């Protein structure tokens, strides 16, 4: 039986596939409209109120405030971002075929748009996927461990608001840097609305710059610094002066981003302040990058920090059923568990 070639080429990138199921123009436009539909402001505010009372669920917040910028980012293993995929009908016809083969995962009573959103999360490998968010439960636990009485927390790669919201609900002052101006604007709006709907005064300081750039006003102020920084080219954001793009050399990235970030964190931390980092080895274009060893080596060779401990980050959303898929398709190496390494300033 001859395998049908339905390879897709768009924006100079190609995705090899035999799958395609035609969509009418009306169906295609309806799918795009549904996937781009956001939660309402009231739904997002309800999430904010629940978060202030201890909840870790924030899907409505992400959907309302962050969806546009989130959809512009793409996994470095994939051909397109969700934003790009939605703009090209053949890509949606590929996903239309994917959702037609398993009615348990993609039930017929749900719309095509809803099922394709699920497919972005479960089976978009090499084509396009939704970028993950850092689990709020984990940052809650870290802040309650290292800042039980409050203090100043520096998040050196802001991400999708989970760490900022955790700091806000735990009564911790939040300092965040990120080069993505659209993200920073969204975080400012989240903070303002959180204060309004919860009646809470938060202490949030946001800087629209990369962590490799020194910010004098933070020097000597920080008690605890933690983030889940870019895993080299595993995720590409393409907004603002990002630390890397598809053409960035790995060793140059270590020299120009990781090393100055570590130096800056040292300057920001108070005496005996804590520096923690979530890192994991990755595979991009069949090349394995040993981020764990390389970044820990840089930290230890700096002579500025003493190793304290590690914490497990259980992230089942990155598990794809086998060691092969975990290593070669998700972009993460062998195990799905990730580690948080903790150091103390010396």
Where are the regions a protein language model picked out?
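Class I S-adenosyl-L-methionine-dependent methyltransferase catalytic core
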Residues: 1-61, 66-86, 90-346
């Amino acid at each position: 039986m001859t395998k049908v070639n339905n390879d897709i080429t768009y924006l100079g990138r190609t995705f090899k596939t035999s799958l395609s199921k035609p969509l009418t123009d009306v169906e295609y436009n309806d799918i795009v409209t549904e996937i781009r539909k956001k939660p309402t402001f009231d739904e997002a505010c309800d999430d904010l109120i629940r978060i202030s009372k201890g909840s870790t669920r924030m899907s409505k917040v992400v959907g309302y405030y962050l969806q546009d910028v989130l959809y512009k980012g793409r996994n470095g293993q994939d051909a397109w971002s969700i934003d790009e995929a939605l703009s090209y009908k053949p890509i949606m016809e590929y996903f239309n075929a994917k959702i037609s083969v398993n009615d348990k995962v993609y039930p017929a009573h749900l719309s095509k748009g809803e099922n394709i959103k699920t497919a972005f999360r479960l089976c978009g490998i090499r084509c396009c996927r939704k970028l993950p968010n850092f689990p709020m439960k984990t940052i809650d636990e870290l802040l309650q461990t290292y800042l039980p009485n409050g203090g100043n927390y520096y998040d050196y790669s802001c991400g999708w608001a989970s760490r900022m919201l955790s700091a806000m609900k735990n009564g911790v002052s939040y300092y965040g840097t990120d080069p993505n101006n659209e993200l920073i604007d969204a975080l400012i709006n989240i903070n303002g609305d959180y204060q309004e709907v919860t009646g809470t005064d938060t202490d949030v300081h946001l800087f629209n710059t990369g962590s490799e750039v020194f910010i004098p006003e933070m020097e000597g102020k920080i008690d605890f610094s933690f983030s889940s920084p870019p895993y080299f080219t595993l995720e590409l954001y393409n907004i603002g002066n990002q630390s890397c793009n598809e053409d960035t050399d790995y060793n140059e990235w270590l020299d120009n981003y990781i090393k100055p970030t570590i130096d800056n964190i040292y300057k920001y931390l108070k005496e005996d302040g804590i520096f923690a980092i979530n890192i994991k080895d990755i595979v991009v274009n069949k090349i394995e990058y040993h981020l764990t060893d390389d970044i820990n080596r840089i930290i230890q060779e700096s002579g500025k920090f003493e190793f304290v401990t590690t914490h497990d980050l259980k992230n089942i959303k990155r598990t794809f059923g086998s060691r092969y898929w975990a290593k070669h398709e998700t972009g993460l190496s062998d195990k799905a568990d990730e580690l948080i390494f903790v150091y103390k300033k010396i």
